[in-house]
Amino acid sequence: MKYKRIVFKVGTSSLTNEDGSLSRSKVKDITQQLAMLHEAGHELILVSSGAIAAGFGALGFKKRPTKIADKQASAAVGQGLLLEEYTTNLLLRQIVSAQILLTQDDFVDKRRYKNAHQALSVLLNRGAIPIINENDSVVIDELKVGDNDTLSAQVAAMVQADLLVFLTDVDGLYTGNPNSDPRAKRLERIETINREIIDMAGGAGSSNGTGGMLTKIKAATIATESGVPVYICSSLKSDSMIEAAEETEDGSYFVAQEKGLRTQKQWLAFYAQSQGSIWVDKGAAEALSQHGKSLLLSGIVEAEGVFSYGDIVTVFDKESGKSLGKGRVQFGASALEDILRSQKAKGVLIYRDDWISITPEIQLLFTEF
């Protein structure tokens, strides 16, 4: 079995009728495929949209609401109804499901990140299928992941999945918009996510985007940098999930980095919030970015910001101004200032295990999304 642990992301369009309401037949089809994969020995996580679609009708709305409060209320009702559909269908095959609602704070806060990771690990080891969504009924903008594509990538990275599958209304990434460009071709294998790939997906200055593809490329960057390959394929075929797991479905495959980021490094790269800035000399910059060394106090040129022991700071090359990465400091700002002023700077500010270098792909993620 090539892909034992798989995260599937199913969007609203794959779960709803033409009027925007929840399609029970589509939910049933998804759960049947999950059951077959589960019985074959796969460990599965489903990141599912559809809470608003499941709930707005029950509250008397004639169509999907647009006001935030109405959508949150619909999600509050619909999340339970959606989970009931999944649970009922899975229990018919003696499979236990579990609901987990997450916000961005569950990834940013180191303790909550660890707790979520542990809970998911127990569920998977016990044979349950976690069904995950963002906590749309209460989340505010500051704590939003923003979309379930990104959420699914964050979850896949957290649990070190073997594959992340996006089921969408487009069967992969195309060189152009296949709906309007007859010359558009599907890319079957993407080795590196770069500016060209972002433009194909609908980046700035491009009109090629289809199927919310840009957010999927953002998500694919998080996943592949964390060592998780990504598959984008159509949800329109009846056995699309099974075929994706077996790599027989038509789609676009994004290759994972050989040395994917460990959980601690993922947190540093994607979620840890910087409390200050450090500028280093050329020697320290090379030691960090090229040789994987710790950051010595002797290589520090300048420090800025209010930070304490154990906080995260961003490190820059003083000569080029380039951001090198982020790390956890062994001294607070005041203590560091005293050390630098004394000109007796000996010791380590950031150990290599508490450091993450910013690769071109990760830098692109920060600047383009």
UniProtKB/Swiss-Prot annotation:
Which reactions is this enzyme annotated as catalysing? L-glutamate + ATP = L-glutamyl 5-phosphate + ADP
Q: Which UniProt keywords apply?
A: Amino-acid biosynthesis, ATP-binding, Cytoplasm, Kinase, Nucleotide-binding, Proline biosynthesis, Transferase
Mention one GO molecular function. Answer: ATP binding
E.C. number(s) listed in UniProt = 2.7.2.11
Instruction: Give the chief site where it resides.
Output: cytoplasm
Residues engaged in binding substrate: 49, 136, 148
Q: What is this protein called?
A: Glutamate 5-kinase
SUPFAM superfamilies for this protein = Carbamate kinase-like (SSF53633), PUA domain-like (SSF88697)
What phylogenetic lineage does the species belong to? Bacteria, Bacillati, Bacillota, Bacilli, Lactobacillales
Question: Which residues belong to any copy of the PUA domain?
Answer: 275-355
The family line of this record is: Belongs to the glutamate 5-kinase family.
| GO annotation, biological process | L-proline biosynthetic process; proline biosynthetic process
- In which pathway is this protein known to take part? Amino-acid biosynthesis; L-proline biosynthesis; L-glutamate 5-semialdehyde from L-glutamate: step 1/2
Q: Which NCBIfam families did the record assign? A: proB
Q: Which PROSITE patterns match?
A: GLUTAMATE_5_KINASE, PUA
**Organism (species):** Streptococcus pneumoniae (strain ATCC BAA-255 / R6)
